[in-house]
Curated annotation (Swiss-Prot):
Description of how the protein assembles with itself and partners: Homodimer.
Pfam families: CoA_binding, Put_DNA-bind_N
InterPro entries in UniProt: CoA-bd, NAD(P)-bd_dom_sf, Rex_DNA-bd_C_dom, Tscrpt_rep_Rex, WH-like_DNA-bd_sf, WH_DNA-bd_sf
Entry binding sites for NAD(+): G90, I91, G92, N93, L94, G95
Gene, per the UniProt record: rex
Protein name, as recorded: Redox-sensing transcriptional repressor Rex
Assigned GO CC terms: cytoplasm
Gene Ontology BP terms: negative regulation of DNA-templated transcription; response to redox state
Domain of life the protein comes from: Bacteria
Entry GO MF terms: DNA binding; DNA-binding transcription factor activity
Origin species: Solidesulfovibrio magneticus (strain ATCC 700980 / DSM 13731 / RS-1) (Desulfovibrio magneticus)
Record's subcellular location: Cytoplasm
Length: 220
């Protein structure tokens, strides 16, 4: 890796490249050009080359990228060429939906523990996992080798869930709640806010309509 400082936007694009490459692989493609990959991902070919350059040299001039090799190289560079064991805390509607989502394991993230503090939910079985009391999280993290925690609790319980995860030794947290979490410097948090995407789409539509109106005014 040429640089330890890699923009988060680059990491997100690399994840998108892997998703597209895996689709191409399933369709039987063995080689892909930077132009086709860029077009499919809605980015410039130069952006793809720049993103990949953080991790070394890829592809053959005039030939393109070998799909399987590039999938492996990106996954290896991102540390997702292995299985990461995860715990999910908060068994509401969103938590249950994530537990039933088959793509997690396919992508290398295996949710092996489900936790909640509600006695009415403890003992419930979802997708083969029994919901366990949050207070047992520390033992479960050690026994199951859990490294990543997913928080899907109500906002007023998110920090408490975070504290349980940190005390258990978890170093990576994906927070699906609206809460802004307080964590030590060595704990990494990613916030998943679905409304960011709604805002982005709404802005794009609004901007297009505004430009259409401006164009119509100029024609007059």
């Amino acid at each position: 890796m040429k640089s330890e400082h890699i923009p988060k936007a680059t990491i997100k694009r690399l994840a998108m490249y892997v998703q597209v490459l895996e689709t191409l692989k399933r369709e039987g493609s063995q080689v892909v050009s930077s132009e086709l990959l860029a077009r499919t991902c809605s980015v410039n070919p130069s952006q793809i080359r720049k993103d990949l350059a953080y991790f070394g040299e890829f592809g053959v001039r005039g030939v393109g990228y070998h799909v399987q090799d590039l999938i492996y190289s990106i996954k290896h560079s991102l540390g997702v060429d292995r299985v990461w064991k995860c715990a999910l805390v908060g068994i509401g509607n969103l938590g249950k939906a994530l537990l039933r989502h088959q793509d997690f394991k396919f992508r290398g993230f295996d949710i092996v523990g489900a936790f909640d503090c509600d006695p009415f939910k403890i003992g419930e079985e979802i997708s083969g996992l029994e919901v366990v009391c949050t207070r047992r999280l520390k033992d479960a993290v050690k026994e199951l080798g859990i490294e990543i925690g997913l928080i899907t609790t109500p906002v007023n319980r998110a920090q408490r869930a975070t504290n349980f995860l940190i005390e258990a030794g978890v170093k990576g947290i994906i927070n699906y709640s609206p809460a802004m979490l307080t964590v030590p410097p060595d704990v990494y948090v990613e916030y998943v806010d679905f409304f960011h995407h709604f805002y982005s789409v709404a802005f794009s539509i609004t901007l297009d309509r505004h430009q259409d109106r401006m164009g119509g005014d100029e024609d007059d």
